[in-house]
């Protein structure tokens, strides 16, 4: 009795001590789940349990089923779900499989109907011709030695693994005959497990909820696999590279798991995912929702390639901090100062912070209206020449030729879910472009069509893919949000269009310059952009 209590307490201590470590990823070994079963008909194993811990199912009953063998599971570390205090339990619907003396697959004829600390599985067939038998636990969605790790998993409250049985948890064991005629075995898990631990110090996110977590891999992590007794592993190659864990339940968790924690807290939002073991590059998208406004989107984290071994789980911490874009990077073309210099919104100035047309949107006349103002656009122009910017920051932007490479060969991909903030408001939407280092032929002197757009009037439009970068090459892309632009003292088209100046003015008009513009469908690159508009500068990689 004392040893059992001590074992549970030690597990609690280990769990708490691990939570305190500030590692991005840390692996833990699952306790093996010890099971034992009677060797012959009607034989029942007796075991002790503490009244306040493990209560055996029907402890005073005798097994009288002459055609059934009793598989008794009673050790605290044998069960298929784990609570945060270190106790393990069998869940409703759990069953085991064993091949009998005739080589026929036999499934336990009964299963727990409720969460229980111990259970006596009854299995048909004879088990008298061998001193060892292979035991299989394929999970509740599995069959015999076939395991299904589903692409959709559900967890109804934080820090619980009760969903493991339907999420692909599985294991095998060699059952060995004991001196008392019983068989005993220790079940080894064959899946890998992620414990996702998001936190945030962003006060905007403290009022939001985690509604789901999307795990994307560069190779398969979800499919139907085989418990292979020869290799002792899950075998088979699937095609599923994405798992979505839904984190909305009932009552307190009807909106999802809270994000109120500044530090890691499994009790607040700990989320468990079952995946196929292997070496994976994971891109994790945390779906966050502001229930007050209905805004829902993602915060993306990409992990380096790592090995995720069977029978282990990995703490994956994530500091969820929505990318913030300031309001200071809107400029008239090649101006010396930003559009709202001296009138910034964060200093109580008149800079509009809401898109025109929304309730509360404003108009300000405090923008530059003459060339004596350093915020005014560069008026220099020579027809047919390379009219390039001469002031920081515009002079350091990609020129129009380079912009064509981003648009035509940068594989622009729309992301309507990635969350970001600017000037105190939450938005989503933008385009992923390949970094120039990954664009073959990238050339500042020649556009992608072989001409020089700096001195020749030109323009074009390209389609935007609706497919996100995959996990394998996500690091090859950079993100530009749809931050809109300023015109006549009004903020326009934020959360609809991205408008980014190049360093090249038009070769055919003294009032225009090249700007890379995009929405969810197209990327446009034309000269029809008035130099006096306040467009974004920077952000290209």
Locations of the language-model features?
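Sec-type signal peptide cleavage vicinity
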Residues: 2-7, 15-408, 414-416, 420-422, ...
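C-terminal, surface-exposed recognition/capping segments
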Residues: 417-541
């Amino acid at each position: 009795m004392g040893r059992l209590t001590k074992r549970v307490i030690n597990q609690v201590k280990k769990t708490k001590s691990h939570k305190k470590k500030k590692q991005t990823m840390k692996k833990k070994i699952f306790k093996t789940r010890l099971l034992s079963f009677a060797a012959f008909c009607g034989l029942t194993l007796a075991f002790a349990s503490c009244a306040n811990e493990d209560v055996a199912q029907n402890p005073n009953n005798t097994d009288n089923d002459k055609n059934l063998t009793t598989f008794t599971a009673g050790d605290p570390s044998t069960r298929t779900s784990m609570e945060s205090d270190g106790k393990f339990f069998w869940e409703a619907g759990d069953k085991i499989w064993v091949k009998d003396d005739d080589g026929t697959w036999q499934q336990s004829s009964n299963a727990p109907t409720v969460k229980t600390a111990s259970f006596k599985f009854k299995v048909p067939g004879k088990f008298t011709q061998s001193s060892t038998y292979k035991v299989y636990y394929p999970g509740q969605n599995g069959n015999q030695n076939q395991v299904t790790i589903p692409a959709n998993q559900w967890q109804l409250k934080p820090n619980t693994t009760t969903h493991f049985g339907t999420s692909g948890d599985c294991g095998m064991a060699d059952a060995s005959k004991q001196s008392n005629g019983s068989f005993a075995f220790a079940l080894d898990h064959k899946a890998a497990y992620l414990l996702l631990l998001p936190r945030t110090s962003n006060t905007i996110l403290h009022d939001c909820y985690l509604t789901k977590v999307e795990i994307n891999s560069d190779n398969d992590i979800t499919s139907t696999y085989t418990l292979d007794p020869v290799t002792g592993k899950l075998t088979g190659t699937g095609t599923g590279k994405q798992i979505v864990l839904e984190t909305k339940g009932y009552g307190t968790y009807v909106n999802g798991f809270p994000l109120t924690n500044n530090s890691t807290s499994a009790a607040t939002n700990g989320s468990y995912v079952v995946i196929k073991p292997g070496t994976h590059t994971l891109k994790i998208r945390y779906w966050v929702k502001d229930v007050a406004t209905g805004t829902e989107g993602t915060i993306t984290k990409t992990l380096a390639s790592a090995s995720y071994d069977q029978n282990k789980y990995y703490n994956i911490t994530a500091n969820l901090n929505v990318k913030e874009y300031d309001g200071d990077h809107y400029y008239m073309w090649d101006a010396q100062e930003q559009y709202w210099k001296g009138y910034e919104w964060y200093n109580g100035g008149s800079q509009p912070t809401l898109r025109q047309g929304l309730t509360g949107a404003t108009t300000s006349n405090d923008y530059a209206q003459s060339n004596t103002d350093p915020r005014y656009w560069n008026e220099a122009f020579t027809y047919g020449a390379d009219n390039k910017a001469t002031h920081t920051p515009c002079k350091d932007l990609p020129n129009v030729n380079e912009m064509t490479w981003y648009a035509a060969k940068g594989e622009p991909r729309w992301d309507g879910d990635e969350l970001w903030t600017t000037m105190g408001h939450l938005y989503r939407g933008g385009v992923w472009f390949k970094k120039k280092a990954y664009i073959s032929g990238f050339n500042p002197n020649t556009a992608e069509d072989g001409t020089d757009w700096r001195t020749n009037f030109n323009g074009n439009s390209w389609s935007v893919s609706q497919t996100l970068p995959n996990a394998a090459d996500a690091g090859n892309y950079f993100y530009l949000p749809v931050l809109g632009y300023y015109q006549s003292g009004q903020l326009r088209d934020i959360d609809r269009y991205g408008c980014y100046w190049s360093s090249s003015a038009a070769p055919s008009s003294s009032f225009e310059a090249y700007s890379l513009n995009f929405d969810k469908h197209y990327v446009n690159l034309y000269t029809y952009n008035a130099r006096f508009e306040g467009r974004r500068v920077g952000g290209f990689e």
